[in-house]
Every structure is written in C-alpha cells, then in structure tokens.
Amino acid sequence: MPLLPSTVGLAGLLFWAGQAVNALIMPNATPAPAQPESTAMRLLSGLEVPRYRRKRHISVRDMNALLDYHNHIRASVYPPAANMEYMVWDKRLARAAEAWATQCIWAHGPSQLMRYVGQNLSIHSGQYRSVVDLMKSWSEEKWHYLFPAPRDCNPHCPWRCDGPTCSHYTQMVWASSNRLGCAIHTCSSISVWGNTWHRAAYLVCNYAIKGNWIGESPYKMGKPCSSCPPSYQGSCNSNMCFKGLKSNKFTWF
C-alpha cells in the first residue's frame, strides 16, 4: 500500500515570513510491504544516540506540550472519529528522532526507518514562545483537507487537499498512530532548500503506527469511541479510545 505523494509547493515561502517551515512526507511513494513491528523496534534500538554522546534534546515541559497538543487535535477532529486512539509518548521513537535531528539534515530519515515510522519535520529561525509554535502549521492544514465521505470510499478513499499539503495534519490525526516521540535540536548551520540557516530550531516528530496510506482515511467517521480496537475494552476519554485512568488530566492549548 503506497504512501501519499509529497509536493514541496508553497511551504518554502514560509521562510521569508519568518515562520516555521515544514518538510513533507517522504517522496518515496512505494514502500516495501508492511513488516512485523518487531523489525521497526530493532531499527529504533539501533538508531539511538550512543550513551556516551547522549544529551536529551527535549525538556519534559516540551515533551508534555507536544503530546498534549497532538491529543487536543486528535480529540477535536471534524467529522468526529469513531476509532481515534489516545496518543502516548514513546522513548524509542524520541531517541530515533534525536539521533536524526542532531545530524541537521533537512529531509526525512533515516531511510531504513521511514518504511515503518511516520515523521513530521519543522524548522524555525529566531525566537519562538513555545514548541507548539513549531507545529501549529501542521494542524492548520486541516482547513485544506476534505475528509472523504464513507460513500466515496468504494473501496479506496480519495485524497482531497486544496492546499500545498495536508499530510502533516493527517499524520497527526491518523487513528492508529498512537505513539509519538520527538526531539528538538538547535542546528548551528543547516541547508534548507538551498538556503543556509544558522541557529535554527529543528523539530523532528516520529509516529507509530505509520499513517498516510493511499486509499485509506485517517480515521473512521462516527460517534466518538464507538469503534475502538478491542484492546481498549470500551474505555473512552475526551473522545478518544483510552487505556489509562479516567481521571487523567490533559492540558489543552
């Protein structure tokens, strides 16, 4: 099942406005067939930053902000989602994101991991108030995305996006992408589409299970939590399939 194709489009113009600029989904539109999740976990373990070099490139505050913002977007999708899963932090995904971010390469990667893991990228030159500022443009793509009606998915769902790209948003709200791991690294120098940026904040977010498959919609439309996977045993919180305590508090932005 191929991934959604990517187009650079107008995203690069955001640089001149002083805003966060976003990379797109990997241009390779024909990945290898799905492999067992254990394969991805072995790759994640092999791609971690060596312990002697390890310095966490994300604070607990930023980690919570990234996770809470994603869950806020997932809980408030329209049309409502019947099978949206609550997203949790995954240390292995975060370490893989850290290993990639520290290389300061403005591209999706590493290539061997992209077969199994979704990824969103953002880069910002200058000051920013919150890590949320680095990913707001991802969620704002929802204004350009038209969710396919069930009658249009016969059997494959059409891809409808009237903007430069919508695939950052669809990865954020892909129902089964219930694990997130991100890293932020300040690159002293990084080449972004032919321009050299200095002291740029580089955000890498990895997602599992990988989303953005052609012919599939991000989630199943319907009453919230009405089609949760059996593993959730009917537990629901804030419009999402939820395995934790129902008293869990979320911080919305």
UniProtKB/Swiss-Prot annotation:
Subcellular location: Secreted
Residues bearing attached sugar chains per UniProt: N120
Keyword Glycoprotein: yes
InterPro entries, per database record: CAP_dom, CAP_sf, CRISP-related, R3HDML_CAP
GO MF term set: peptidase inhibitor activity
Signal peptide: 1-24
Name the record gives this protein: Peptidase inhibitor R3HDML
Protein species of origin: Homo sapiens
Xref: CDD domains: CAP_R3HDML (cd18815)
General function of this protein: Putative serine protease inhibitor.
The family this protein is said to belong to: Belongs to the CRISP family.
GO cellular component, one term: extracellular space
Record's keyword terms, sorted: Glycoprotein, Protease inhibitor, Secreted, Signal
Residue stretch(es) of the prosequence: 25-56
Covalent S-S links between cysteines: none
Gene3D superfamilies: CAP (3.40.33.10)
Domain SCP: 67-207
A Pfam family this chain is assigned to: CAP
